[in-house]
A protein has these predicted regions:
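Short, surface-exposed, charged amphipathic helix/loop patches that serve as local interaction elements
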Residues: 2-89
Length: 89
């Protein structure tokens, strides 16, 4: 399973301009290596994103370097983070 996300603002990855990213599901090995979920559930059962962790998953699942994740527009970061979180439900 994978999700294609069209970016509002293009970034550069591997020396090339990128206007869409394909996110694949993380493997169990990758989840264990990151050691955290991309979201948190509080006492009232509200879900919120953990953006630092989500950024790690975006890099891994999209196959781009962390420096490219840092170039993302905030709206794109939010959309990609929720897409990553959806892999865990």
């Amino acid at each position: 399973m994978s999700d294609v996300v069209t970016l509002r603002v293009a970034i550069e990855a591997h020396g090339e301009p990128v206007s869409e990213l394909t996110l694949r599901r993380p493997t169990v090995q990758e989840v264990r290596a990151i050691k955290a979920l991309p979201y948190k559930i509080d006492k009232s059962e509200e879900v919120s994103l953990d953006m630092d962790v989500a950024a790690k998953y975006i890099a891994v699942c999209a196959g781009i370097p962390p420096s490219s994740v840092n170039q993302l527009d905030l709206a794109d970061l939010n959309a990609l983070s929720w897409a990553v979180a959806s892999f865990f439900s």
